[in-house]
């Protein structure tokens, strides 16, 4: 296992306006170069990046940071949370200096990260399932499947409403968003709010 630096670089560019489908290409390129059974560690910040900028700033706000995290850990790879990102700490942290962090500052952000890591650990399909990509300019769309588990994941990488086409095999299905518990019926397209993500089963 090593850091997925290339994917992280593409992730940053996508959230600044590059096509969401670039992430699908970056994911494939990283994994095509790996031996079977090996993984890349996916992240939105680490000990190097935290000295420069925190995810809640780099990806516009807390909602953008969460969307970026979903786009980072669920296509492939190991999931990294770097200390302080789970509470949305807004300032750079020098790795070599003591920096006090208010761990109770944003309990909603903490709970959201906790939920996502819980889903990652609970569902083999999300953690290591086979991925089927559906390229789009503004929404990252892909399926994950392992055995009987079948998920459709959508991440709006823009800070504005975007409409995206639903893969035909999912149209008409009743699904549940595992992130919120909300149930919905999928039509041919869905409008997503700024930085919204859906983990549908």
Residue ranges and their predicted role:
Residues 35-59:
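Active-site clefts of carbohydrate-active enzymes
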Residues 1-40, 62, 71, 90-115, ...:
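Active-site-proximal helices and loops of the catalytic beta/alpha 8
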Residues 47, 72, 84, 116, ...:
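Conserved, mostly hydrophobic/aromatic
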Residues 80-87:
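Short acidic/histidine-rich active-site segments
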Residues 50-53, 88-93, 161-163:
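Short catalytic/ligand-binding loop motif for oxyanion handling, primarily in non-cytosolic enzymes
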Residues 161-181:
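Beta-strand-rich binding/interaction modules
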Residues 186-201:
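C-terminal beta-strand-rich structural cap/linker in extracellular carbohydrate-active enzymes
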Residues 134-168:
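Carbohydrate-binding surface patches
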